[in-house]
Amino acid sequence: METDQKKRPTGMTILLVLSFINACWNIFSSMVMFMATPKLAEMAQNGEVENLMAPFTATMSEEMRESMLAGMNMIAQIDTKYWLFLGILFIGSLMGVIRMFKGDKRGLHIYAISQILILINASFYLYPHQPQSSFVSDLLLTAIFVLLYYLYFKRMEMQNNEPQTPELP
């Protein structure tokens, strides 16, 4: 259902801009990681990750350095298909955001489906390497954005269905 673009609430515009930035950033970073992960995995296997990270970790505490190296080694273990699927799914998310920006409620469906598939993708490839709290926070953030978009579209529909009072000359 098309809605009047002029009546889009400011809060929805802010959410759309944030979602647009998030989708663009994730498309870019997913493609970079898709290309870089094989080399990173090779470096992790050869024990070269610590040398690679040395300039960045030199001023860190031992605990922070170990945590960062563990994170890099974890990233090296993630299948490259995860990054490919993630990039494709964020393209879908971006398409949904663009449609919503134009006032098309179908964009909400595209966005929501893409975000759910992103969570499913991460469940197979990413979350097994991370604490459960990561899944919960991602799920909550996704649910909040989808719910807010839904509520804004409902509000816009109600505003568009209100009887118009004729203007006096």
Where are these regions (language model features)?
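Topology signature of small-to-medium multi-pass alpha-helical membrane proteins
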Residues: 2-169
